């Protein structure tokens, strides 16, 4: 049984561990086969082959245990989403594996149940079970984590037309996601909480109602992005320059270093491209650009 899962951008500014946007920039393909040997076998290039250290394998192990499935399985993973760039690579493998296992064994899991198993696979990648990326890998579109325990996910109905431009720097850091999560402050002030809530509610409202100005205002973060800025020193300059060219907004994609830019027909697209190049050259950082669109839904 084969399933695919697309890349995603978590957080979208103020929505740390809450919001995620699935997009069609890249995808992983996962094939799950029954295997008469015991246990879980993993195959694929450039990935952990120990199932306990692999997000797809860890998710699969939980399902087999919880559903009392005695047969072994083989998981073949074709990685299309580059790892370590804030594009939901680890979560995509887990989500695709869960969807494939659900179909293979006809388990009839709900979307939220699939998110539950997928998010626990993330422990293999960063040490914590966070549901944001995997929720868009199961539902598609832009998702909101209503509750983590029990898992409750809401898919937002988007009424704003925009395109996506990903600025993907060639920056790689060992254990980057784990380090990025360690930078998030454990305590914030009431003023910081109020501002963050204002931004998040504005962003969600703007996406649902199609209010461009609300999205532009809302896609700004005063807590997590600020705490992580030393990882991405180019970010504020890049964001300022693309907004000067009437981009809707920009944010760090997940744990970075990729920057997600939203633009529309009011934006100066060529001006955005020039601005990106100017800023990244000034920081002596090589990068690639990837145009994308929202991956709305999966057919399973």
From Swiss-Prot:
Its EC number is 2.7.1.39. InterPro entries: GHMP_kinase_C_dom (IPR013750), GHMP_kinase_C_sf (IPR036554), GHMP_kinase_N_dom (IPR006204), GHMP_knse_ATP-bd_CS (IPR006203), Homoserine_kinase (IPR000870), Ribosomal_Su5_D2-typ_SF (IPR020568), Ribsml_uS5_D2-typ_fold_subgr (IPR014721). Keywords: Amino-acid biosynthesis, ATP-binding, Cytoplasm, Kinase, Nucleotide-binding, Threonine biosynthesis, Transferase. ATP binds at residues 82-92. It is found in: Cytoplasm. GO terms for biological process: threonine biosynthetic process. Its main location: cytoplasm. The keyword Endoplasmic reticulum does not apply. Pathway: Amino-acid biosynthesis; L-threonine biosynthesis; L-threonine from L-aspartate: step 4/5. GO terms for molecular function: ATP binding; homoserine kinase activity. It catalyses: L-homoserine + ATP = O-phospho-L-homoserine + ADP + H(+). The keyword Methyltransferase does not apply. GO terms for cellular component: cytoplasm. It comes from the Archaea. Catalyzes the ATP-dependent phosphorylation of L-homoserine to L-homoserine phosphate. HAMAP family: Homoser_kinase. Belongs to the GHMP kinase family. Homoserine kinase subfamily. This is Homoserine kinase. It comes from Picrophilus torridus (strain ATCC 700027 / DSM 9790 / JCM 10055 / NBRC 100828 / KAW 2/3). The lineage of its organism: Archaea, Methanobacteriati, Thermoplasmatota, Thermoplasmata, Thermoplasmatales. The gene is thrB.
């Amino acid at each position: 049984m084969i399933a695919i899962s697309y890349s995603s951008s978590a957080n979208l500014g103020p929505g740390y561990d809450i919001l995620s946007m699935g997009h069609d920039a890249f995808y992983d393909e996962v094939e799950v086969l029954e295997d008469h040997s015991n246990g879980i076998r993993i195959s694929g290039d450039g990935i952990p082959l120990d199932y306990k250290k692999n997000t797809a394998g860890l998710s699969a192990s939980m399902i087999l245990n919880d559903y009392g499935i005695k047969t072994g399985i083989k998981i073949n993973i074709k990685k299309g989403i580059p790892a370590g760039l804030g594009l939901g690579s680890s979560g995509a493998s887990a989500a695709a594996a869960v969807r494939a296992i659900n179909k293979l064994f006809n388990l009839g899991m709900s979307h939220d149940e699939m998110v539950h198993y997928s998010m626990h696979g993330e422990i293999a990648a960063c040490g914590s079970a966070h549901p944001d990326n995997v929720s868009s890998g199961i539902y598609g579109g832009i998702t909101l984590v209503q509750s983590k325990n029990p898992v409750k996910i809401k898919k937002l109905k988007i009424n704003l037309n925009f395109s996506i431009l990903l600025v993907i720097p060639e920056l790689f850091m060992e254990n980057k996601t784990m380090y990025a999560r360690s930078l998030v402050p454990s305590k914030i002030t009431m003023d910081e909480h109020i501002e963050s809530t204002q931004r998040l509610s504005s962003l969600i409202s703007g996406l649902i109602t199609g209010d461009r100005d609300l999205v532009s205002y809302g896609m700004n973060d005063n807590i997590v992005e600020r705490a992580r800025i030393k990882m991405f020193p180019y970010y504020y300059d890049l964001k300022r320059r693309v907004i000067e060219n009437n981009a809707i907004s920009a944010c760090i994609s997940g744990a970075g270093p990729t920057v997600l830019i939203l633009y529309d027909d009011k934006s100066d697209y060529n001006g955005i491209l020039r601005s990106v190049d100017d800023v990244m050259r000034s920081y002596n950082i090589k990068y690639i650009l990837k145009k994308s669109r929202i991956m709305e839904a999966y057919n399973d």
